[in-house]
């Protein structure tokens, strides 16, 4: 590959080595069978783990996004498979740019198509256009914080988004901060997400990125673009709501959830019961499916199978569609345990599909966590890495809604950077590290969103008004008491809602199926209902008392017997004439006599009038409803924009959290690697220290500046050096050597990179062999040298001893305590060479001299040999201090005589010195003239034994 690329570029093409630093205008190639990541400006290599799916492009893109954020540019070119798909998501989430080769232009379109399908690709281009596009983007990329001079997109006044009402240049002169505010407002009005609930930093970075992609120089120009280009508005909205999720995100947290929440829930579930779970902000569904798999795993382990229902919600419809489909790229294999992949997925066409039994337990629905009503009676509520995108007040609203949703004793599971804060007193902590809580008490019903009044005016609920004034009740009872012998009666308001009851009215009441209400239309028995409604309507219209004709009641309705009943409505006098404040008494009178003259009610006429009025009200209601529908459509658009803004903030903070998590994981891995290197270094140091101690030689290490880097304990005998001297120049230290050229020799060794040896003497009378050896630190330019001082005094003494005995005419050998020869002199060596043993194989160092004398008995008079052996042994064993004897040792045709002396070596090792001197001339003279031999044998001190022994 390197040679292939080199033919098409003038830039150097290099294959990466570990810790290689980035360089401009250079092409770096990843070596085979490795994973390459980026740490700062250095490339790190690691071997592939063949036990798991290898995705080197994803790994590199992710590390690049973590390190460079919005400065990262990812390009996916021709290739098979889906490697790079997850990585472009990480780059996009960090604010970087992702580009793919146009699949139509690619020889293998698998990787580009997979990346484009994520929605994270900013542009799909032909191969020849990618380079110029990136260069132009980097030149024109704006810096939003510098453009606005502000940090908050607040205070915008609103702007119309109808293309027909916006003219090019209409925003000229607008301040950048105001332009940013209008952009956020337009964005919020484009859907059901209010982006004012999102943290401003997220919004700013996303707008900056889109401005860079569209190459727009300033905010006012981008505002005009948004008002004219609905496609760009949709792209910006998608930018804010890009989902960032994965299976088993934070595996340790899910393991803790399974142990402390899921297993107990399964164990406590009754037969036939249902476990209810709500996962809010589910994105593309990975978290919901993770929970379902964990519950199924717990079911199998416990042998219990309660019904499981998971409600997975998200504000973005596209995310819900993706999640509901249940199709996932092959890259998820890196996130899931192998057993779960095999149990809960099927593979087809390079994709993983969730199994039907898992899919059927999950209901995916669009839901706005901040505005839509929450679910109820949940055993578990999860909302991970969503709150971190919200402003604090929005976080509180979301938390209170989730508190209302979870039952007492249920569980709440949040993301790693999220906390309860405002509702923490209502929960107990199960795992602070993994953000798991248990509800202690039920939550209050969430209040209507503070912005709801801008869009919807809710109708007052038809429920009991607990705050009805007591004085009105009393006035109603007083009116009834003055007029009648009090019959059973009800006090109702202008909405026909019951406020109070007088007497026994239960037989006239009947609770109907459906929503609870105190409206008489939901409470009176059927025969009385139309009459009571007509009477109340007439009394309200005329402002006077109204009574019905006698109403026949069949048996079994109000009692066992048939009866007749008359209804009467009496207005209650109050201090206000408003319709809303009017109260009425509805009395139930038994019909026991003729009409009392009070005007009755013509049911047909009153019903007709009522119908006319209701038709008029219906027409007005329709007009009002149409206006409300239009208002709701506008409100829905604003809410959608708000939801999109929140989702984008969620994604941005989640991306930041993912980056931090990735950095944390990389730091943990790096820490483990460093710890391993430290352990190895400690072992190496211990080995080196032990080696220098056992070698018992003075050793000093210096760097290229001749500064001491370390030394052995023995070096303190020659140099006045201590631990505090590490880091000092060697020349500053005094030493006990006659070696003025020490520093010069070290410099020559470093410059020539060659070994240096020299013998020097010490001021203490000892001698040393100095060895200098240069070295280089691997993968570094650092160099140094090590110098050792070997004490060779004993060797020099031995050499001196050898020179002394070599100067003697006698044949000298030194024996150890066993009779083995340790040392011979030159005369001994010459004699052996002249007498058949030139290589000293039989009489040289290492041979046993006593043994050689025993062997010689066959060739020489055994008496001499025997006495020689006994004499030498007596000296070796300490029985004699000196042994001497004369013996013949003839050469061919020449008789010769020798004298042998043996003296012990003093010391713990023992041994002896044996010397042989030729005395042939002396012996001949002695035999010729005995009187001339009075001086004794040559070399004898006159105390030795007589006799001779063969020379071995």
Curated annotation (Swiss-Prot):
Disulfides per UniProt: none
Residue ranges annotated for the CheB-type methylesterase domain, each copy included: 1-141
Pfam family, one: CheB_methylest
Signal sequence region: none
Ranges for region Disordered: 923-952
Biased composition (Gly residues): 936-952
GO CC entries: cytoplasm
SMART domains referenced in this protein's UniProt entry, alphabetically: MeTrc, PAS
Domain spans labelled CheR-type methyltransferase: 168-440
Superkingdom of the organism of origin: Bacteria
Polar residues bias spans: 923-935
Any GO BP annotation: chemotaxis
GO molecular function terms attached to this record: phosphorelay response regulator activity; protein-glutamate methylesterase activity; S-adenosylmethionine-dependent methyltransferase activity
Coiled-coil blocks: none
The protein, known as: Uncharacterized 104.1 kDa protein in hypE 3'region
Record organism: Rhodobacter capsulatus
Lineage summary: Bacteria, Pseudomonadati, Pseudomonadota, Alphaproteobacteria, Rhodobacterales
């Amino acid at each position: 590959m390197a040679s292939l690329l080199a033919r098409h570029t003038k830039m150097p093409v290099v294959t990466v080595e570990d810790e290689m630093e980035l360089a401009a205008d250079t092409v770096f190639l990843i070596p085979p069978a490795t994973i390459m990541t980026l740490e700062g400006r250095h490339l790190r290599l690691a071997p592939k783990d063949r036990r798991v799916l290898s995705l080197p492009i994803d790994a590199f893109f992710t590390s690049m996004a973590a390190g460079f954020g919005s400065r990262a540019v990812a390009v996916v070119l021709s290739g098979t498979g889906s490697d790079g798909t997850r990585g472009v998501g990480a780059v996009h989430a960090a604010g970087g740019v992702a580009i793919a080769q146009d699949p139509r232009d690619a020889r293998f379109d698998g990787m580009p198509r997979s990346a484009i399908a994520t929605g994270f690709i900013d542009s799909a281009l032909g191969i020849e256009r990618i380079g110029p596009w990136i260069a132009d983007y980097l030149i024109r990329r704006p810096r939003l914080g510098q453009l606005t001079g502000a940090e908050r997109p607040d205070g915008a006044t609103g702007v119309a988004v109808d293309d027909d009402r916006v003219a090019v240049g209409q925003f000229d002169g607008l301040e950048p901060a105001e332009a940013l505010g209008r952009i956020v407002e337009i964005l919020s009005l484009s859907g059901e997400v209010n982006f004012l609930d999102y943290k401003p930093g997220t919004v700013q970075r996303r707008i900056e990125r889109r401005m860079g992609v569209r190459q727009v120089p300033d905010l006012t120009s981008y505002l005009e673009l948004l008002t004219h280009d609905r496609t760009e508005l949709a792209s910006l909205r998608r930018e804010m709501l890009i989902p960032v999720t994965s299976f088993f995100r934070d595996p340790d947290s899910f393991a803790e959830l399974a142990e402390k929440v899921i297993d107990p829930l399964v164990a406590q579930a009754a037969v036939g019961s249902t476990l209810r779970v709500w996962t809010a902000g589910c994105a593309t569904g990975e978290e919901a499916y993770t929970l379902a798999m964990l519950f199924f795993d717990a079911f199998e382990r416990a042998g219990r199978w309660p019904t499981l229902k998971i409600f997975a919600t998200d504000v973005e419809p596209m995310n819900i569609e993706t999640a509901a489909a249940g199709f996932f790229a092959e890259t998820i294999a890196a996130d899931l345990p192998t057993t779960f992949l095999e149990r809960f997925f099927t593979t087809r066409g390079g994709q993983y599909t969730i199994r039907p039994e898992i899919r059927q337990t999950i209901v995916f629905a669009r839901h706005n966590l901040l505005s839509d009503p929450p679910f109820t009676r949940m055993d578990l509520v999860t909302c991970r890495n969503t709150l971190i995108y919200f402003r604090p007040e929005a976080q509180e609203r979301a938390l209170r809604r989730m508190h209302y949703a979870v039952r007492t004793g249920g569980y709440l599971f949040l993301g790693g950077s999220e906390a309860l804060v405002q509702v923490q007193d209502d929960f107990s902590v199960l795992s602070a590290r993994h953000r798991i809580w248990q509800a202690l008490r039920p939550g209050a019903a969430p209040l209507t969103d503070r912005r709801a009044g801008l869009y919807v005016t809710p109708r007052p609920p038809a429920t009991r008004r607990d705050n009805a004034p007591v004085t009105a009740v009393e006035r109603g009872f007083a009116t009834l008491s003055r007029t009648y012998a009090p019959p059973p009666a009800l006090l109702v308001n202008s909405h026909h809602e019951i406020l109070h009851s007088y007497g026994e009215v239960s037989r006239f009441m009947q609770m109907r199926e459906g929503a609870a209400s105190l409206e008489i239309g939901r409470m009176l028995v059927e025969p009385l209902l139309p009459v009571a409604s007509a009477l109340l309507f007439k009394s309200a219209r005329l402002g006077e008392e109204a009574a019905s004709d006698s109403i026949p009641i069949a048996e079994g309705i109000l009692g066992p017997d048939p009866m007749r009943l008359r209804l009467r409505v009496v207005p209650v006098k109050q201090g206000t004439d408003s319709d809303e404040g009017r109260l009425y008494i509805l009395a139930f009178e038994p019909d026991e006599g003729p009409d009392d003259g009070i005007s009755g009610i013509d049911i047909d006429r009153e019903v007709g009038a009522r119908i006319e009025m209701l038709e008029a009200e219906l027409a007005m209601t329709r007009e009002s409803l149409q206006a409300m529908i239009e208002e709701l459509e506008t409100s829905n658009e604003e809410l959608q924009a708000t939801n999109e803004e929140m989702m984008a903030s969620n994604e941005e903070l989640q991306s930041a959290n993912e980056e931090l998590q990735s950095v944390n994981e990389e730091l943990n891995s790096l820490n483990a690697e460093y710890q391993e290197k430290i352990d190895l270094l400690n072992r190496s140091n211990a080995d080196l220290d032990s080696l220098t101690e056992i070698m018992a030689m003075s050793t000093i290490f210096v760097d290229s500046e001749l500064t001491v880097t370390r030394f052995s304990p023995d070096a303190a005998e020659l140099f006045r050096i201590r631990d505090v001297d590490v880091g000092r120049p060697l020349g500053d230290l005094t030493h006990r050597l006659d070696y003025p050229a020490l520093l010069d020799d070290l410099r020559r060794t470093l410059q020539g990179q060659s070994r240096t040896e020299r013998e020097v003497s010490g001021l203490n009378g000892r001698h040393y062999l100095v060895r200098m050896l240069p070295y280089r630190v691997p993968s570094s330019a650092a160099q140094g040298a090590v110098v050792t001082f070997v004490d060779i005094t004993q060797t020099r003494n031995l050499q001196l001893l050898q020179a002394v005995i070599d100067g003697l005419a006698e044949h000298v050998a030194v024996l150890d305590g066993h009779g083995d020869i340790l040392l011979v002199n030159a005369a001994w060596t010459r004699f052996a060479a002249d007498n058949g043993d030139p290589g000293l194989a039989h009489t040289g160092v290492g041979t046993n001299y006593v043994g050689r004398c025993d062997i010689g008995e066959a060739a020489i008079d055994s008496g001499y040999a025997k006495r020689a052996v006994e004499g030498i042994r007596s000296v070796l064993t300490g029985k004699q201090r000196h042994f001497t004897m004369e013996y013949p040792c003839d050469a061919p045709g020449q008789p010769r005589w020798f004298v042998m002396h043996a003296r012990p070596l003093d010391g713990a090792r023992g041994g002896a010195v044996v010397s042989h001197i030729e005395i042939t001339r002396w012996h001949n003279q002695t035999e010729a003239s005995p009187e001339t031999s009075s001086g004794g044998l040559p070399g004898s001190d006159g105390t030795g034994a007589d006799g001779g022994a063969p020379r071995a």
